[in-house]
């Protein structure tokens, strides 16, 4: 079995690592957006033996781990975790912020000097880590291996894929509004064939043909508020989060981008991660590779709803099962 180092980076209050002896072949860094440390205890009974419980059982759990800054938006959060410093030094102070040198508000990863690789809105691909002022752990890995170790970042959010991967990444991939993965010319001249093939298979269709139904009896979600209550908003600003949710109808009406606000946004990202490991030959030589994955569907659901609602817990619970499956797949590799 190849040496795989699987680390879970909880944005932004905790860090857990599944440790192995010796130099790892592959490091997999995972951020779960809006996954607070307290959820490990709060939802512990929901965990299977191959997911979080395995990480807790075989790894380390650091409970007193803080970055002294605010606000904890996606971009400064991911940047702080991967650079090990605060926005004052790495420069990413928000998702959007006013840049005095340019006298305008900018987006954290926008870059007019690059172009999209892949389908969709060209502006969605004008992205790079050029505004990040500090090196990341992934950058330091590239430097320590004389650029021989591969680094790939991925997420359904552009900033969550680009910033963790750092300046020297081989690739970063993120999802466009049509449910397909894209990149930019910062990383290469054309999208890798395996990513084109992945997009052409339209995995999102098989996921969106399912009704989103709770995996457990609603009565078992006793630590959360009930379904259909006045405190919840709408998923993607238009979908009532009352279960079961007919995702296929929403897909037909509004396109595949709806997958971002479901647990299957995380599923399709895990599928892409396994495709990257296979097609990029990650972990196949003596140089440590790094795969930075940021699961963001929990963030979309958390913003639309609330942490105390059972809809959010359902999303977390579904993701826990996906983590277990992903962990098993990694171990087999």
Model regions: which residues?
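Metal-dependent active-site segment of extracytoplasmic phospho-/sulfohydrolases and closely related
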Residues: 318-333
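Loop/turn elements at helix/coil->beta-strand transitions in domains of secreted/extracellular proteins
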Residues: 23-28, 58-62, 89, 146-151, ...
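Terminal, contiguous helix-loop blocks that mediate binding/assembly
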Residues: 301, 308, 324-325
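Short, structured active-site-proximal loop/turn typified by the sulfatase FGly-forming signature C/S-X-P-X-R
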Residues: 40-89, 150-154
């Amino acid at each position: 079995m190849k040496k795989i180092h699987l680390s879970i980076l909880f944005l932004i209050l905790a860090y857990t690592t599944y440790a192995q002896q010796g130099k790892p072949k592959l490091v997999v860094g995972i951020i779960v957006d809006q996954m607070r440390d307290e959820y490990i205890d709060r939802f512990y009974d929901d965990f299977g033996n191959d997911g979080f419980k395995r990480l807790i059982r075989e790894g380390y759990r650091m409970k007193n781990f803080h970055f002294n800054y605010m606000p904890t938006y996606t971009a400064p959060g991911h940047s702080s975790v991967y650079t090990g410093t605060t926005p004052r030094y790495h420069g990413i102070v928000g998702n959007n912020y006013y840049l005095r040198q340019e006298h305008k508000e900018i987006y954290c990863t926008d870059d007019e000097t690059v172009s999209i690789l892949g389908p969709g809105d060209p502006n969605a691909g004008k992205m790079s880590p050029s505004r990040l002022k500090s090196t990341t752990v992934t950058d330091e890995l590239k430097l320590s291996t004389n650029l021989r170790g591969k680094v790939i970042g991925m997420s359904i959010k552009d900033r969550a894929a680009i910033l963790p991967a750092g300046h020297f990444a081989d690739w970063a991939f993120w999802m466009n509004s049509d449910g397909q993965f894209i990149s930019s010319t910062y990383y290469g001249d054309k999208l890798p064939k395996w990513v084109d093939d992945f997009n052409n298979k339209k995995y999102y269709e098989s996921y969106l043909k399912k009704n989103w139904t709770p995996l457990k009896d609603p009565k078992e979600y006793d630590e959360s508020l009930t379904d259909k209550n006045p405190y919840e908003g709408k998923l993607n600003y238009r979908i009532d989060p009352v279960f079961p949710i007919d995702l296929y109808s929403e897909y037909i009406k509004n396109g595949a981008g709806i997958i971002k606000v479901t647990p299957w946004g995380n599923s399709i990202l895990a599928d892409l991660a396994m495709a990257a490991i296979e097609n990029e030959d990650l972990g196949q030589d003596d140089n440590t590779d790094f795969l930075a994955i940021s699961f963001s569907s929990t963030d979309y659901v958390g913003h639309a709803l609330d942490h105390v609602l059972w809809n959010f817990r359902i999303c977390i619970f579904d993701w826990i099962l996906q983590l277990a499956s992903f962990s098993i797949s990694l171990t087999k590799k």
